[in-house]
Amino acid sequence: MIRPHLAATVKGFPVYVHTIEHADGLVLVDTGMIDSTPELDENWEPVPMPENVPRDVLCVINTHLHFDHCGGNRLFPGVPIHVQARELADARTEPDEHTVNSWVDFDGAAYVEHDGEAEVLPGVRLLPTPGHTRGHQAVLVDTPEGLVVLGGDVAYSFRELGTGATEGQRRVLALAAPTWLAHAERPKVPMPR
């Protein structure tokens, strides 16, 4: 089962993280933004990690390393954090205005770097979806109802996703599967425009 959890807002715009209840344990996709820092625009409003998100997760998967997606990583020292190698390298060597270095590299960070598609657990796979960042990845989850895509910021809206403007968007559209975006409360099967 996949569950969304509100993790931050900007000007009322929600940012969700997701939990995957897997037979091997709980997987957390992105960790939101649990507090603020002077480096951030005051329009960003952090949300404490929801009480219903357990801290004893099997692993974390970051779709990318922008602050609203990895800001809670430091709550999970020693827990494997799956990320594309390109994303981690870019966050460390070419940070942009959405990168908070101390939230990427923190005491106890246990990154597992991937170079392309990978299976994290049976039925939980990573798909590189470059566009929003060069190392962005989506998470593909096999459920009893079929494939579900956790798309992160592959697009900010389903309308944008439908344009297929980036390589990552085209990869997700080709799956024709229910897709969660980080800013959408519910999944939708995206349609090309």
Show which residues each predicted segment covers.
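Zn-dependent metallo-beta-lactamase
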Residues: 1-46, 174-177, 187-193
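Residues that act as N-cap/strand-start positions at coil-to-secondary-structure junctions
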Residues: 12-14, 112-114, 133-135
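Structural motif
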Residues: 25-27, 59, 146-150
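Metal-dependent catalytic neighborhoods of phosphoester/phosphodiester hydrolases
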Residues: 71-77
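Short hydrophobic/aromatic-enriched beta-strand-loop microsegments
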Residues: 80-85, 150-152
